[in-house]
Amino acid sequence: MNRSDLLENPRTQTESGFLLIHKPVGMTSSDLVVTVRKKLGFKKVGHTGTLDRAASGLMILPIGSCTSFSSVFLEKEKSYEAWVRPGESTDSGDKEGEILESLSKEQTETWFQEHQEKLRDLFEQVPTWETQEAPEVSALKVNGRRRSDLFREGVALVPAVRKIKIYRYELGEFSPESISFQIRVSAGTYIRKIVMDISDRIGFPLRLEKLVRTSIGKLNLNQADSYESLLDGKIKIHPPETILDFPTVEVPDTEVRNVLNGRKIKLEWIPVNEFLLVSPEEEILAWCKKEEHGIHELDYKYLRVFPKN
């Protein structure tokens, strides 16, 4: 069976690869991993970054030896479609949190009529933002514990400020009922915190109503299988060469065994930074990284070797 075919009898599968799944609202990233293990029978399943329970969208789940590549996706750019509800705010910035303020429809419409130009200006300034303070309700760890757990216990948290970059931004609907935008951001950017910060700056309650992650790096949501397909046990395994961005260097048959045993071999060329060594059959043998300032044919190191089963 081709590795990119649908799984017909998943519990017999021993191969590695990636699953692209559309996570539904109401499920944590960890919940999705558990479901994959139960439904498909894979013992080794990872994920490449969390997606809030209240959000839906693309999740990349590596299986088998490809779990070694989980960290690769943590630093990828990500795209989202967001819908904001004017007139209500929560401590988490989305509908999962505790309500801090809630205005009536009439109050919201009255405020909007008087201040919509200033509010629009704040939303249009988002592409200029360069730093962001992580929300108190988040999965970030402080001494091994989630910030959200500490916040709920009343522990005072030190602000966790990080640099962010907005690569693309488009403001859509703008009304007292709903504000929407599309955005592409650097890794670690919280979309709900953008909404919370705008709310704080203007003194008007706002929160995320809906958030959909539409891409991670070069991978898009339209490539993902539905959650229903996962429950039916029919889901696509994507081979690593179609998912990973690394350049490849082919290893001759005579050197394959040396690579699998972790011995360096002479390479005709070494790509910049990280790369993959592959067999003539295009099987991934090793994940490598060029040594800093390396110019010699052996100036690289193995990050991970993938022995054959």
Curated annotation (Swiss-Prot):
Keywords attached to this Swiss-Prot or TrEMBL record, sorted alphabetically, are:
Isomerase, tRNA processing
Could you name the active-site residues? D52 (nucleophile)
EC number assigned by the record: 5.4.99.25
Can you tell me where the transmembrane regions are? none
Gene Ontology biological process: mRNA pseudouridine synthesis; tRNA pseudouridine synthesis
Q: Which reaction does it catalyse?
A: uridine(55) in tRNA = pseudouridine(55) in tRNA
Top enzyme class of this protein?
isomerase
InterPro entries reported for this sequence: PsdUridine_synth_cat_dom_sf (IPR020103), PsdUridine_synth_N (IPR002501), tRNA_psdUridine_synth_TruB (IPR014780)
Sorted alphabetically, which SUPFAM superfamilies does this protein's record hold? Pseudouridine synthase
Q: Name one Pfam family in it.
A: TruB_N
Query: Per its UniProt record, what Gene3D superfamilies does this chain match?
Result: Pseudouridine synthase
Q: Name one GO molecular function term.
A: tRNA pseudouridine(55) synthase activity
Report the function annotation for this chain.
Responsible for synthesis of pseudouridine from uracil-55 in the psi GC loop of transfer RNAs.
Similarity comment: family membership: Belongs to the pseudouridine synthase TruB family. Type 1 subfamily.
Record's protein name: tRNA pseudouridine synthase B
Source species, please? Leptospira interrogans serogroup Icterohaemorrhagiae serovar copenhageni (strain Fiocruz L1-130)
Q: Which gene encodes it?
A: truB
